[in-house]
Amino acid sequence: LSSIAPLSVAYAQTPPAALPYRNPQLSPAERARDLVSKMSLEEKALQLGHDAPALPRLGIPKYNWWNEGLHGVARAGIATVFPQAIGMAATWDVDRMRNTADVISTEFRAKYLERRHPDGGSDFYRGLTVWSPNLNIFRDPRWGRGQETYGEDPYLTGRIGIAFIRGLQGDDPKYYKTIATSKHFAVHSGPESNRHREDVYPSLHDLEDTYLPAFRATVTEGKVASIMCVYNAVWGVPGCANAVLQEHYLRRDWGFQGYVVSDCGAAANIYRKDALAYTNTAPEGVAAGFENGMDLICGDYRNGMTTDPENIVAAVKAGHLSEATVDRSLQRLFEARIRLGLFDPQLPFANITAKDYDTPAHHAKSREMAQASMVLLKNQGNLLPFKSAPRTIAVIGPNADSFDTLVGNYYGTPSKPVTVLDGIRARYPNARILHAQGVGLIGPAEAPVPDTALRGLRVQHYANPGLQGAPTSTEAAANARVEWAGDRESSARWTGTLTAPETGEYRFRFSSENGYRVWIDNKLVVDEWGVGDAPSILSGSIRLKRGKSYAVRVEGFQRGARGQQQLL
């Protein structure tokens, strides 16, 4: 939650470093308690959202809790990308997994230093609280996020999860290297389309035997410092307001000492009429969450599922939420920031620099993990590697030259990505390499619009994601194609003409990680500007006549995503 004008509080002076919460000799609990005691109710409310603003009068910098690290630092530009989570789990190698997570945590520290504000503040995807691992059990291939998990086995999920958490959090007795987050708690395995309204009723046997073991293991053995509560309801009660899950199991039975953050938009699910509608009003929903174990709200701005801090203040003033509960949550949150060393001058991670990401040593670790994850490849008769270079090689399939296939989801931007096709060409430079997409992943193959079909194309680039203001550059273009840098917000608009090679029905989309729109013949063919969960594969159709030229306009934007985006 960002600082909202009615609740913003500005002060002129910052406190001396000698105040108790700045004293590293005191315990994190003592320091956090001292800090929270100095805040007004309005200031407290502002600190309970994922984008916590600075409190200048207390010398507290802003902090954004939202950071992704499923298989490497994600959405923060160039970083080492490891295999997707389900591939790493296939190794059954807990030592390798812990070492991998240690590399990832080093890169998180480097990325934090790279963009750290002078006062120590951090921005979106530049913090040290990592929202991984995903411990949900993957038993239905129709769930589109199964690749984020460690598979179908609760025991394996727990062991791999523990290793990942230990690698992320480190082994220093006083400070966390980063904070890991076991998610999504609990009983959450799709379907995606109904995730904000789903109400699940697992049997006690399934709950204890399938859905909870990995979470229990990462709390009791892995000592994970954070838990993310789910969108869905369990037994009629929203996950983020579910005392059975968050108080009975998590804290009473398992002894969890950390904080609970909502999945993004899940707090709004508690009260929204188009979601779980568990309470009648937003203040009542906020109260239900905090009183039953939730400590931090992640708001989903893209889908309008935010929970403004005014609702927290209103809940307290109406008697729905006690200020003591607010203080309890804030103390947990500030203990976490203190244990990350965000207020202290000397840390055990001082040897990490802002350049310690995307290094050759880290690339080697990623390659080793990728090799270890190939457990279903049977090299019968020692066919590979080829004894001699073939004269002709056919590379067929929609994943052969796909960047998306390499990085999966929740990914960083590799500095030197190599697709299957790239690798074969490099390995056999003198061979004749034939490539065909063949089919699409979920339908006919999608082909890029050829340069020859486009005429007079010009592109305008903007230094913001909304095509706002004057363009930073305008130039001729051969195609509606862009390779955006991976660590900035920008947008572009292409205009020109399109000539159809044949008469027929054509489908168009833009292979964007974020939003896009396509107009043909001044008709809006596809509009995915407000895409909620990128990437989208939505396309639109229009009938075109052979040889006729049509006005074409394509718009797209990125928010820290990678490039290689084009009109299909």
Predicted regions and their residues:
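A general secondary-structure signal for short beta-strands and their flanking turns/coil
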Residues: 491-493, 503, 513, 537, ...
